[in-house]
């Protein structure tokens, strides 16, 4: 255990033991302790850049909005649980609900648990959310907008109405060691924006690594983004594991690396929506996107009868945008149906090389 970790634990223990709500840490920043029943938002509002708001073990009620750069919001592990305020609706609500009142009220009105909220003119940089559970929110467990260098680690996002963890208009994020389970849509959803039609955003190297994504409609959705990595994750029991999605807007989505993931038995059945066919048995799906690298993944036993079913699927875009110059190489695929590799896209330059597989549509891709 390193000295920083020892100092952090000692400070937390001292706060719990003495009953103090805030105390200076060894780094010169303040740790604000919040016990169940106390206001998390009040502690967040009083914190300065570099401070830590530490949530004690137990259940905390209500939504939290973070607008302070450099803030750390940390729990004490999965036993630190954030749930909606008593009486709050658990039905999914549309984006852009009531915006009046305090930031936390706005976050709650949108159906979110923790919001990291910046604006086009004033982003929120360097926020960390760690070591807690967010569950039961109508829309999203954690939602970030205009957040640069956001870190989300060791978070459990479970049974939220739409997304477990979601970002829009954000760059250089790190999502590591999280569990997203049984959320209504994607466990982890990264997009340029969901409200407007815009070209893909360069994320500056966002990393999604070593997460467990299970029982969601889609494990990870990458929508209209460029330049990020999805690596070392375990995805199982979803309707679809990974979606990399673009459309006709420019610049085109792409430059995503999906490598060294375990993608197994994503055979949950999800009905058709207004935007998408029914889903079942989809491993990695590329649609309307370019210059991606899909490599060294283990993709097994994903079985379904949807047009999007299969181990790795390059799918013809619903809006007619082709997928081009995608490299699918050195993956291990077994027991996927209707095939391990599926290409229904007329785009040029997509290559399939060095994959270990038995079946493909069309034939000859293995």
Locations of regions flagged by a protein language model:
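Parallel beta-helix/beta-solenoid
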Residues: 48, 68-69, 77, 119, ...
């Amino acid at each position: 255990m390193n000295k920083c970790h020892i100092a952090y634990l000692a400070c937390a223990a001292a706060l719990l033991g003495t009953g103090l709500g805030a105390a200076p840490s060894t780094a010169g920043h303040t740790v604000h302790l919040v016990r169940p029943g106390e206001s998390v938002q009040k502690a967040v509002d009083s914190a300065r850049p570099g401070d830590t708001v530490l949530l004690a073990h137990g259940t905390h009620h209500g939504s939290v909005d973070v607008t302070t750069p450099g803030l750390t919001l940390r729990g004490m592990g999965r036993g630190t649980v954030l749930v909606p305020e008593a009486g709050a609706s658990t039905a999914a609500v549309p984006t852009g609900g009531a915006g009046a009142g305090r930031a936390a009220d706005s976050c709650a009105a949108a159906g979110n648990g923790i919001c990291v909220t910046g604006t086009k003119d004033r982003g929120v940089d360097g926020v960390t959310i760690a070591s807690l559970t967010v569950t039961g929110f109508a829309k999203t467990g954690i939602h970030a907008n205009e957040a640069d260098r956001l870190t989300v680690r060791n978070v459990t996002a479970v049974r939220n109405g739409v997304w477990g963890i979601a970002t829009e208009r954000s760059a250089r994020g790190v999502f590591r060691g999280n569990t997203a389970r049984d959320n209504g849509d994607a466990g982890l959803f990264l997009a340029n924006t969901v409200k407007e039609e815009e070209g893909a955003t360069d994320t500056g190297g966002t990393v999604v690594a070593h997460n467990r994504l299970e029982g969601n409609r889609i494990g990870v959705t990458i929508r209209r983004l460029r330049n990020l990595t999805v690596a070392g994750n375990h995805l199982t029991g979803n309707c679809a594991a990974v979606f990399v999605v673009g459309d006709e807007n420019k610049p085109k989505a792409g430059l995503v690396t999906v490598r060294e993931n375990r993608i197994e038995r994503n055979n949950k059945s999800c009905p058709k929506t207004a935007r998408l066919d029914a889903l079942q048995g989809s491993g990695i799906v590329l649609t309307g996107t370019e210059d991606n690298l899909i490599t060294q993944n283990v993709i097994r036993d994903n079985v379904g009868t949807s047009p999007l079913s299969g181990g790795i699927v390059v799918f013809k875009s619903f809006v007619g945008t082709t997928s081009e110059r995608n490299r699918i190489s050195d993956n291990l695929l077994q027991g996927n149906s209707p095939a391990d590799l599926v290409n229904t896209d007329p785009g040029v330059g997509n290559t399939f090389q060095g994959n270990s597989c038995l079946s493909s549509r069309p034939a000859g891709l293995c």
